[in-house]
Amino acid sequence: LLALENTMQGKVLPTEYLAAASRLTREHGLALHLDGARLYNAAVKLGVDAGDITRHFDSVSVCLSKGLGAPVGSVLCGTADLITRARRLRKMVGGGMRQAGQLAAAGLYALDHQVARLADDHANAQLLADGLRAAGYDVEPVQTNMVYAQVGDRAEALKAFAAEQGIRLSAA
């Protein structure tokens, strides 16, 4: 199994790369899985339908809360056999929820209404990155909704300024 993440730290894997990965796994008899927690961010950035990305994969997981606003939940997509095996394994390890209809409804709403808003998230991330650059911070190029900046010894000052604006910052 080869598992790829798209986006990866906010960076989009090009469709040509995905096609090459698909060819490679086929040549070696491997399955190809997409961790699509931010699949729709990648699709919006590339200007393509999510299916243009997922067609290269044997299985895909999609998070409904990251960026789409559902309270919880993910979807696993694959063959009927894969889904049957996944359900069995989920039960074996104690997974599953009873009466999850309300959460499923929130997930469906997110898919129907929130994907179109991801371009706004991307634009806001770019606006933040531009502001940080203008203030003299070293910021990586932004493709989607994630901003990575090196703030050095000015971290506390930036955190305090952001807090005054009602923004919480996290750092690694």
Model-derived segments and spans:
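Conserved PLP-enzyme active-site core in the AAT-like
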Residues: 1-165, 169-171
